[in-house]
């Protein structure tokens, strides 16, 4: 007596469907015709042959019905199924990571004008203003510094005694003693006051630079600087245009050389 494997599998499937109370979970029953490809979560496949209607009970498995195919058709291998699932998982991870990266990188904020930015210290404002408006700040700073030093020197000439003031501020005794016993007197006193008034001098310089910049812009001597974002976009467009022109020139040259080569080859063939 020969053992018919397909018939035995069909009987087991029919018995499982007819006795649902023995199963812990109800699955899906499908009425299928033709060959049936049954595979579970572990990618094990069983091919059931049969032309009659069969009810199958599926709890933790997936059922795929296919039409009859030639005898040389084979079911997909478990390795292929696992490879496809791995590809889908990797692609999902890539998309998720790219979205997280795009959300985690906020756009860079445009830097405010250092003349109007009050959130930074006086020294930082002075440095940024020097970088952006150096041509305006240097003359203004030289003029204001000359006025400051001249004022202090004039006060020293008039006999203004600044030593008590320096002691009140809390300067070291070594500096105060130098000013007391100095022979040059007026110049050194003016220089000491000049250095002490550095915060006030920087503030006056920034104010004078701001007024000068507004005046120059209102009369058309200085253009208003565009925002950083627009400036970068303009630069990128200019660079793109230059690259496109160079590529077109190179393409034209190559086309001409190819045409010349073809003409030479055709001429040689005609001569031969």
From Swiss-Prot:
Name assigned to this protein: Protein FAM210A
Principal location: membrane
Subunit relationships: Interacts with ATAD3A.
Keyword set includes ATP-binding: no
Subcellular location: Membrane; Mitochondrion; Cytoplasm
Stretches assigned to the DUF1279 domain: 117-229
Listed InterPro entries: FAM210A/B-like, FAM210A/B-like_dom
UniProt feature coiled coil, ranges: 229-271
Transmembrane segments: 136-156
Region annotation (Disordered) ranges: 246-272
Similarity section: Belongs to the FAM210 family.
Function text: May play a role in the structure and strength of both muscle and bone.
Entry keywords, A to Z: Coiled coil, Cytoplasm, Membrane, Mitochondrion, Transmembrane, Transmembrane helix
Any single GO CC term annotated in Swiss-Prot or TrEMBL for this entry: membrane
Recorded topology in the membrane: Single-pass membrane protein
């Amino acid at each position: 007596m020969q053992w018919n494997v397909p018939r035995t599998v069909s009987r087991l499937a029919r018995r499982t469907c007819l006795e649902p109370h023995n199963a812990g979970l109800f699955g899906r029953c499908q009425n299928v015709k033709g060959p049936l490809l049954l595979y579970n979560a572990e990618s094990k496949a069983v091919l059931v042959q049969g032309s009659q209607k069969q009810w199958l009970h599926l709890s933790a498995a997936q059922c795929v019905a296919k039409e009859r195919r030639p005898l040389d058709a084979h079911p997909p291998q478990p390795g292929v199924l696992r490879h496809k699932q791995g590809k889908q998982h990797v692609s999902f991870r890539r998309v998720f990571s790219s979205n997280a990266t795009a959300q985690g990188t906020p756009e860079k904020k445009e830097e405010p004008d250092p003349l109007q930015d009050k959130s930074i210290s006086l020294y930082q404002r002075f440095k940024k203003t020097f970088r952006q408006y150096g041509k305006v700040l240097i003359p203004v700073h030289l003029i204001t510094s000359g006025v400051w030093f001249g004022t202090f020197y004039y006060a020293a000439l008039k006999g203004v005694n600044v030593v008590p003031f320096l002691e009140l501020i809390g300067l070291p005794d070594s500096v105060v003693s130098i000013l007391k016993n100095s022979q040059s007197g007026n110049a050194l006193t003016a220089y000491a006051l000049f250095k002490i008034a550095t915060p006030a001098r920087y503030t006056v310089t920034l104010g004078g630079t701001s007024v000068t910049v507004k005046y120059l812009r209102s009369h058309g001597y200085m253009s208003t600087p565009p925002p950083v974002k627009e400036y970068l976009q303009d630069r990128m467009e200019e660079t793109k245009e230059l690259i496109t022109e160079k590529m077109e020139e190179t393409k034209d040259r190559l086309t001409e050389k190819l045409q010349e080569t073809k003409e030479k080859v055709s001429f040689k063939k005609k001569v031969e």
